[in-house]
Amino acid sequence: MTKKISFNAFEMNCIAHQSPGLWRHPQDRSVEYKDLEYWTDLAQILERGFFDGIFIADVLGIYDVYHQSAEHALTGAVQVPVNDPLQIVPAMAAVTKHLGFGVTTSISFEHPYPFARRISTL
């Protein structure tokens, strides 16, 4: 039996993940992360490319360990500002048929009931 490879994209609902200043494609649109069309276009591109899914990461705070300050994270836009990944999944799912979705979530900072309600509504 042959094994199939799965292709999954990794993204974050912010301007940059943890690689600011690295080479980027001239057609990169990540600065449009606040526009819903950016996310629906991305979902359609991934589906046309036969990706199995997309994982949208999240972080629940600002990195403030380096030099005991958040200054470098803020000036470098390192995962900040970041938006809730759960808000874009329904729109992305509405424009695709086969793309799977995964998101970072946490019940450490919120009550389990509203968390379960939100996830079950997706």
What are these regions (language model features)?
Residues 96-102:
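Short, surface-exposed connector motifs at secondary-structure boundaries
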Residues 57, 103-105:
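Short His-Asn-centered micro-motif
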Residues 84-88, 92, 103, 111-118:
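Generic hydrophobic, aliphatic-rich segments that mediate packing or membrane embedding
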Residues 30-39, 107-121:
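Glycine-rich anion/phosphate-binding loops
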Residues 1-96:
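N-terminal beta1-alpha1-beta2 module of alpha/beta enzyme domains
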